[in-house]
């Protein structure tokens, strides 16, 4: 399965609670942290929800 690298670049303060919960569900603990996740429909849906807070890169 393909992998994607997600970097959290903007704070979730001031946004709805469910967006902060999505950031935590993606595995982030600190701002500017990067995580590598499987490229699945569930992960893509979470990224879509917080696309204004994260940067996405494909890992080859």
Swiss-Prot record:
Which InterPro entries does the UniProt entry name for this protein?
Ribo_uL30_ferredoxin-like_sf (IPR036919), Ribosomal_uL30_bac-type (IPR005996), Ribosomal_uL30_ferredoxin-like (IPR016082)
The UniProt entry's GO biological process terms, in alphabetical order, are: translation
Q: What Pfam families does UniProt report for this protein, alphabetically?
A: Ribosomal_L30 (PF00327)
SUPFAM superfamilies on file: Ribosomal protein L30p/L7e
| Matching CDD domains | Ribosomal_L30
Q: Which UniProt keywords apply?
A: Ribonucleoprotein, Ribosomal protein
Question: Which GO molecular function terms does the record list?
Answer: structural constituent of ribosome
| Entry GO terms, CC | large ribosomal subunit
Q: Which residues form a coiled coil?
A: none
The entry describes its oligomerization and partners as: Part of the 50S ribosomal subunit.
What family is this?
Belongs to the universal ribosomal protein uL30 family.
**Record's protein name:** Large ribosomal subunit protein uL30
Which species is the source of this protein?
A: Dehalococcoides mccartyi (strain ATCC BAA-2266 / KCTC 15142 / 195) (Dehalococcoides ethenogenes (strain 195))
């Amino acid at each position: 399965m393909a992998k994607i690298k997600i970097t959290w670049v903007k704070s979730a303060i001031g946004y709805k609670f469910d967006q902060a919960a999505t950031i935590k569900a993606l595995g982030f603990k600190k701002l500017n942290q990067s995580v590598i996740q499987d490229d699945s429909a569930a992960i893509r849906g979470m990224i879509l929800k917080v696309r204004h807070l994260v940067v996405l890169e494909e890992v080859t």
